[in-house]
Amino acid sequence: IVGNPNLVKGGYFHTLVLEPDKLEQYKIIEAASRNSKIYKDLSGGEMCLLQKEADELQVLRDKLMANNVCKDLIQDIDVEYEVPGLIQLEDEWWKLKADIKNNTEKLVIDLKTTSNIDKFAYSAKEYNYDSQAYIYSSYFNMDMIFIVVDKISGKIGIFDCSSSFLERGKEKVEKAVDQYRLFYKNNDFDPAQYLVTKTL
């Protein structure tokens, strides 16, 4: 089976919240698991959603939109969804796509799901949401916030970005550019000779 179930679930959740008219692009199978014969027969090797997963994500979507603060941020008077962009940072080009651009509140909003909202600050560092926030806020010239829904508890959080969070994102972007240039733009570089050295 090709694909990652978490990516499919994340995409489905975004579509549920932002573009429910496009849900038909997702194939949903009524099966106990992806190891079952019926799933394998119907999926054709694709990564599909299980019906129970789609039902769980619908519950999360309903909880999110039942919260007045979140609903207003997502469905404000002047909002745009899935807004693409291209920005030059450190003399390299970066592609982006914002989930929500709220022009009323002057905010860029990213939807996230998590398995533990109490550890989201750690996840944000681990999954480089700091560099995402730096790139997006630089491009749109707006503050960025994350609306986060806990997949287990249904708890909702709104996380804004401190200056130190954005600065760390900027440093990661600079480091990524250095690595990119070393691996892809330096003809003398031999990847087999690359190693990391650190003192413990």
What are the language-model segments listed below?
Residues 2, 42-49, 118-127, 162-165:
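Short histidine-centered catalytic/ligand-binding loop motif
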Residues 1-96, 194-200:
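Metal-dependent nuclease catalytic cores that hydrolyze phosphodiester bonds in DNA/RNA
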